[in-house]
Regions:
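Single conserved hydrophobic/aromatic residue that forms the stacking wall/gate
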Residues: 1-9, 13
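Small/polar loops that bind or transfer phosphate-bearing groups
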Residues: 5, 17-20, 88-92, 113-114
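Active-site-proximal catalytic alpha-helix in oxidoreductases
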Residues: 10, 57-62, 118-127
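NAD(P)-binding Rossmann-fold cofactor-contacting core
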Residues: 14-36
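Short, charged, surface-exposed secondary-structure boundary motifs
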Residues: 25-28, 70, 121-124
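Rossmann-like adenosine-cofactor binding region
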Residues: 38-111
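Adenosine-phosphate binding glycine-rich loop
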Residues: 91-154
């Protein structure tokens, strides 16, 4: 719901929120729309993904589907869905290149994992707890260490 909330404040586009349980999608969309006093988040059943209007949309995969050791699992396995995407972000970082990301990349699009999100959540917490600021250079060094530790070669 955080991703929905942060994107819902913008006046540019509507967002389709797909969930395997339509009731959950409706509840999240209602809460986000009420918070921002708009109707930018549209709840949808994940089975209706082909009904997403337009093309060149950003897809953010926020489930645990595809998380190690289930590396080859994916929520939507239809190439047509990925053809319409402009870019994909998978919150998972292990494996570093999920099946979701592979399907996005197979269409010649960019795909990103959740490692930087994990890093910057940690940086924010560290700064808050220790009343300090971490430089971009320091964060970049930690990112490189995380990549090395996880065997990620980007």
């Amino acid at each position: 719901s955080t991703l929905s909330s942060s994107s819902a404040a913008s006046d540019v586009y509507k967002r389709q929120l797909l969930n395997r349980t339509v009731d959950k999608a409706e509840a999240i969309a209602q809460a986000v729309n009420a918070h921002f006093n708009n109707d930018k988040v549209i709840p949808m059943n994940i089975a209706d993904y082909a009904d997403i209007p337009g093309e060149d949309y950003v897809v953010i995969q926020t489930t645990s589907v595809g998380l190690h050791p289930n590396d080859e699992a994916v929520v939507i396995d239809d190439e047509a869905f990925y053809k319409k995407a402009a870019v994909g972000v998978d919150i998972i970082y292990n494996p570093a290149n999920t099946k979701f990301m592979k399907l996005i990349k197979a269409q010649g699009k960019n795909a990103y994992n959740g490692l930087k999100m994990l890093l910057y959540q940690g940086v924010s917490a560290y700064e808050l707890w220790n009343d300090c600021k971490i430089t971009k250079e320091e964060a970049d060094e930690v990112y490189k260490c995380l990549q090395k530790e996880l065997g990620i070669d980007e």
